[in-house]
A protein has these predicted regions:
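Conserved "repeat-terminator" motif of extracellular CCP/Sushi domains
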Residues: 132-136, 292, 320
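Feature responds to low-complexity, polar/acidic, surface-exposed segments characteristic
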Residues: 223-256, 271-287, 294-319, 326-338
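Active-site nucleophilic cysteine motif
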Residues: 85-86, 286, 290
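Alpha-helix C-terminal capping/helix-coil junction sites
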Residues: 44, 94, 265, 325-326
Length: 338
């Protein structure tokens, strides 16, 4: 189709000039599943790229037999309006390891529809009438669905800064001395020029990038002849990024779950106590569990009356409890109470 031709033409025309690719899917509401699979295969090559599940629970596998047109990594930009087939493209990039996703969590429409009209069912529809029916839920190669949950980007940043963050990651590998560069090992190897990143034009994006780095991702600073591990906070201080704020918590270092807690914080799922602490040894109430699950699952905000007599929709946890209950993940204690 036209989408795949666009990607093919771009990669073939500029392939000898580019060592990074950026696909901006911010505000892209999706389209045809086949187009998303064909487009992402220009980066990933042959293999399975999606599974579609119908109402009977049967799965169909979809993929490509074509070879990749580039070995350079791709950066996908996403926001809350990146939806449907665009989310499949982003999740394919994530699961195949051919690049990273930058921006905010996507919309969460992981279903496909068919259209019944006079062409597909002549005699049943006329005068331009048609009916659209949701028939499939799709899953990425790794087995996860984007439906409701959406795609959580590798680097969770303000979508308005996503393009500038991507540009910072497009610095070429240093030739000779590594001094003045950062190296980021995250799905692929990325380089950041400190001169560019510290400039007034890119300081906000650089700050956002450092804040978004999750635990376990290796950040290194050039020493001239080699690389040395460095913490994002140390880089921010050295570069005078006064607006930098770590998303981690001050009281998790001694916890056996510290890395997991801080990773959830990096992706905006765990918010802690509001004062920079998490209280990792504390107990979790049922309401707090629902709040955590609702955030992790990207639950839709419920409307109407609460299904529990002791939970008001005006309570800070009211919408979360009702959203998670609507999914069947929690139940009340009986008598209409939670």
């Amino acid at each position: 189709g036209e989408t795949v031709e666009h990607f093919t033409d771009g990669l073939e025309t500029y392939g000898d000039q580019a060592d990074r690719w950026i696909v901006d899917l911010r505000g892209n509401g999706g389209g045809v599943v086949d187009a998303a699979i064909g487009a992402v295969s220009t980066f990933s090559g042959s293999g399975l790229l999606a599974y579609l599940k119908d109402s009977d629970g049967s799965y169909g596998a979809f993929g490509s037999n074509d070879e990749a047109l580039t070995t350079a990594p791709v950066i996908v930009l996403a926001d809350e309006n990146t939806a449907s087939a665009s989310e499949l493209f982003a999740s394919d990039v994530r699961d195949t390891g051919v690049g990273i996703v930058i921006g905010s969590r996507s919309f969460g429409k992981g279903v496909a529809q068919i259209v019944l009209d006079e062409n597909s069912l002549p005699g049943y529809f006329d005068n331009g009438d048609a009916m659209k029916i949701t028939t499939y839920r799709f899953y990425a190669p790794g087995g996860g669905t984007t439906d409701t949950v959406g795609v959580i980007p590798h680097l969770l940043v303000d979508p308005d800064l996503a393009d500038e963050v991507a540009v910072l990651l497009c610095s070429p590998a240093p030739e000779g001395s590594t001094e003045g560069y950062l190296r980021l090992d995250f799905n692929r190897v990325w380089y950041i020029s400190l001169e560019q990143a510290s400039s007034p034009e890119y300081q906000a994006a650089f700050t956002a990038l450092l804040e978004a780095l999750p635990v376990g991702v290796t950040l290194q600073s050039g020493t001239g002849s080699s690389w040395a591990a460095v913490e994002p906070a140390a880089v921010a201080e050295a570069c005078g990024l006064t607006g930098y704020q770590s998303r981690g918590f001050s009281d998790t270092a001694g916890s056996p779950y510290a890395s997991l807690i801080d990773r959830l914080a990096a992706y905006g799922i765990a918010s802690g106590s509001g004062d920079g602490t998490y209280n990792p040894e504390g107990s979790l109430t049922r309401a707090e569990l629902c709040a955590l699950l609702a955030k992790a699952l990207n639950c839709r905000v419920p409307t109407g009356e609460s299904r529990f007599t002791d939970v008001s929709m005006d309570d800070w946890y009211g919408m979360c409890v009702n959203a998670v209950a609507a999914l069947g993940l929690v139940e009340g204690v009986g008598g209409g109470r939670f």
